[in-house]
């Protein structure tokens, strides 16, 4: 089997139906789908939907019930353990999939045959983000030599394709941040650190839907990157500069943009989404982000980072914005400036 597709989101029966229907209509059927059901109140309805597709998919449709701690990354590790495809990728049930998606993904995975194949991410829904290419990554990189990839790879799991031989290397990885999101940041970098060959393609293969119930907790994200930094210092000391740059790119730019630039329609017109956003992207969290970044900006570590990190010496938009004080940065359209 060529491909294992993993959906970490199984919250709504209607979304699961549309997702499985779109997979049934794929031009290339050389894949399996591993579906995580992670909402107990919807489980009965979701299983009824799944039954409708068992005759078509047979053993190619595998269902996992949410882990005890509800961690996306724990669920992803469980899916990795049973994945049979030569390549593995995350495709969530709340995102629409074109009928050529699998064929294109498999063709590119076979053509480049790298440990990690990354596509341009495209976020839609409550967050709209279509970033430009962050650096010239238009070749196959040897990650033992080309450290730049670790600074500029996007911190998401859902825009990448991994070799099965790579995902098997993180089955026993001890995930320290269980208060996570569908981005799976810690496991994403754990995979990158184990990889040997990498390729970036500057076009989107799919659009990732960001719903209103995505928690954006600044302290949880900071903890994730602190864990990554600790691991890198211990096991990959030559990548310290790259991971530190990745940390501040996410914490100061992306997270600030995600918290402050929620798409207007969801914020004001959809009742359920409005209620979710008032909780999960509330002024309390925005203020926590403000306090956290003000503290970071005054720290000796950040001051040294600004002046000496090699990626901060590169003259580009994102390095300039990282240098900018949060009090002025927060009034910018950060996500637009990164496009």
Model-derived features: positions:
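Glycine-rich, basic loop-to-helix element that forms the pyrophosphate-binding segment
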Residues: 66-83
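Donor-binding/catalytic cores of nucleotide-activated saccharide
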Residues: 96-190, 194-197, 211-216
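Acidic donor-binding segment of Leloir-type glycosyltransferases
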Residues: 20-65
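N-proximal low-complexity "stem/linker" segments adjacent to membrane-targeting elements
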Residues: 1-22
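Cell-envelope/extracellular polymer assembly enzymes that use nucleotide-activated donors
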Residues: 2-6, 32, 186
């Amino acid at each position: 089997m060529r491909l294992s597709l993993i959906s970490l989101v199984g919250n709504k029966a209607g979304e699961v139906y549309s997702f499985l229907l779109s997979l049934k209509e794929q031009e290339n059927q050389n894949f399996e789908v591993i579906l995580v059901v992670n909402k107990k109140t919807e489980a009965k309805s979701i299983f009824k939907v799944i039954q409708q597709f068992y005759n078509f998919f047979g053993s190619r449709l595998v269902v996992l019930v949410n882990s005890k701690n509800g961690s996306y990354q724990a669920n992803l590790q469980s899916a990795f353990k049973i994945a049979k495809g030569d390549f593995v990728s995350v495709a969530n049930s709340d995102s629409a999939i074109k009928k050529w998606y699998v064929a294109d993904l498999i063709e590119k995975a076979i053509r480049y045959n790298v440990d990690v194949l990354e596509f341009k991410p495209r976020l839609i829904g409550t967050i709209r983000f279509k970033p430009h290419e962050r650096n010239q990554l238009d070749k196959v990189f040897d990650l033992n030599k080309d450290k730049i990839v670790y600074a500029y790879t996007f911190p998401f799991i859902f825009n990448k394709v991994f070799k099965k031989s790579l995902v098997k290397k993180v089955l026993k990885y001890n995930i320290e941040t269980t208060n996570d999101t569908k981005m799976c940041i810690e496991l994403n970098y754990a995979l990158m650190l184990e990889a040997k060959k990498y390729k970036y393609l500057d076009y989107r293969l799919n659009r990732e839907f960001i719903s209103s119930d995505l928690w954006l907790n600044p302290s949880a994200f900071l903890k994730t990157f602190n864990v990554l930094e600790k691991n890198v210092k211990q096991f990959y000391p030559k990548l310290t500069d790259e991971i530190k740059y990745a940390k501040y790119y996410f914490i100061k730019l992306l997270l600030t943009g995600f918290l402050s630039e929620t798409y207007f329609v969801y914020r004001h017109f959809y009742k359920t989404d409005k209620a979710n956003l008032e909780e999960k992207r509330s002024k309390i969290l925005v203020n926590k982000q403000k306090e956290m970044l003000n503290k970071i900006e005054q720290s000796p570590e950040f001051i040294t980072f600004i002046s000496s990190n090699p990626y901060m010496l590169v003259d580009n938009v994102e390095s300039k914005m990282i240098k900018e004080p949060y009090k002025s940065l927060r009034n910018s359209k950060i996500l637009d400036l990164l496009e």
